[in-house]
Curated annotation (Swiss-Prot):
Cofactor(s) named in the record: a divalent metal cation
Gene Ontology CC entries for this record: cytoplasm
Signal peptide (residue range): none
Organism field: Saccharophagus degradans (strain 2-40 / ATCC 43961 / DSM 17024)
Entry's Gene Ontology molecular function annotations: coproporphyrinogen oxidase activity; metal ion binding; protein homodimerization activity
GO annotation, biological process: protoporphyrinogen IX biosynthetic process
Taxonomic path: Bacteria, Pseudomonadati, Pseudomonadota, Gammaproteobacteria, Cellvibrionales
Annotated function: Involved in the heme biosynthesis. Catalyzes the aerobic oxidative decarboxylation of propionate groups of rings A and B of coproporphyrinogen-III to yield the vinyl groups in protoporphyrinogen-IX.
Protein name: Oxygen-dependent coproporphyrinogen-III oxidase
EC numbers: 1.3.3.3
Disulfide-bond pairs as recorded: none
Residues at the catalytic site: H108
Alphabetical list of HAMAP family matching this protein: Coprogen_oxidas
PANTHER family assigned: COPROPORPHYRINOGEN III OXIDASE, MITOCHONDRIAL, OXYGEN-DEPENDENT COPROPORPHYRINOGEN-III OXIDASE, MITOCHONDRIAL
Length: 303
């Protein structure tokens, strides 16, 4: 592991942020991403980019961060005790897109690299990331396209990768207190170093590069579908699950808050509007009920 390895990862991530913002701003057609560069007093910094009140995107955030510190936070050493006493660097791109139209799913993507070093010891490093889709009014065509794109990105790295990381995604994006998944899943991987640096880095790039290929065709298909206030209300209600997951379970959110990260960037993923209703239940035989009965049931979408 050399300094040039770390520089290559950082250069890729900065370029990925640029590319994703360009593509999504073009899809929106009205607003652009506004950048907020920031520095972290304890070490590092980042570029937060947010698009709000667009024609298609109600709120979208695409964040790059590169932070470093002299010791690991509790959230990281809890399941990796060998990291205690090491300095660390973490860099990544993380994004969440909340569309206006309830027929367009929310999407989340993240790719990241982590390294912990100590004098006289081999560095501990890994890649992580993935992407997942959260529909409000599900569509089989969209789910198949999303998962087929994910499967194709994984294919060059072995037949085991897609089913393994698809299953991990289903398990990770799960709200235990609701006993339901957050959406229809996608990919989730973490602690990836078994392929060696070059191939592990290549895999992370394949995932990062395929996100817009997975998401943009779905947005284009659904962004002009008509909707009513009741459907908008259901979208806002379901966004509540997004908030619950991010604040209760999400590793990245917890890591960021525990390391004294930049709160505005960490909470950038939260939707601008959301609603909770006491003991709400969908009416039988409605599209809302179908979300629970069909789409929030893990299944094999890829062909």
């Amino acid at each position: 592991m050399t300094a040039s390895n770390k520089q290559a990862v950082k250069a890729y991530l900065l370029n990925l942020q640029d590319k994703i913002c360009q593509v999504l701003a073009a899809v929106d057609g009205k607003e652009t991403f506004v950048e907020d560069s920031w520095q972290r007093p304890e070490g590092g910094g980042g570029r937060s980019r947010v698009l709000t009140n667009g024609a298609v995107i109600e709120k979208g955030g695409v964040n790059f961060s590169h932070v470093h510190g002299s010791s690991m936070p509790a959230s990281a050493t809890a399941h990796r005790p060998e990291l205690a006493g090491r300095s660390f660097e973490a860099m990544g791109v993380s994004l969440v897109i909340h569309p206006n139209n309830p027929h367009v799913p929310t999407s989340h993507a993240n790719v990241r690299f982590f390294i912990a070093e100590k004098e006289g010891a081999e560095p501990v490093w890994w890649f992580g990331g993935g992407y997942d889709l959260t529909p409000y009014y599900g569509n089989d065509e969209d789910c198949r396209h999303w998962h087929n794109t994910a499967k194709a990105a994984c294919a060059p790295f072995g037949e085991d990768k897609y089913p393994r990381y698809k299953k991990w995604c289903d398990e990770y994006f799960y709200l235990k207190h609701r006993d339901e998944p957050r959406g229809v899943g996608g990919l989730f991987f973490d602690d990836l170093n078994e392929l060696g640096f070059d191939q592990s880095f290549a895999f992370m790039q394949a995932v990062g590069d395929s996100y817009t290929q997975a998401y943009v065709p779905i947005v284009e298909r659904r962004k002009d579908e008509p909707y009513n206030q009741a459907q908008r209300d259901f979208q806002l209600y379901r966004r509540g699950r997004y908030v619950e997951f991010n604040l209760v379970y999400d590793r990245g959110t917890l890591f960021g808050l525990q390391t004294g990260g930049r709160t505005e960037s960490i909470l950038m993923s939260l939707p601008p509007l959301v609603r909770w209703e006491y003991d709400w239940q969908p009416q039988p035989n409605t599209p809302e009920a179908r979300l629970y009965e069909h789409y929030l049931q893990p299944q094999d979408w890829a062909e």
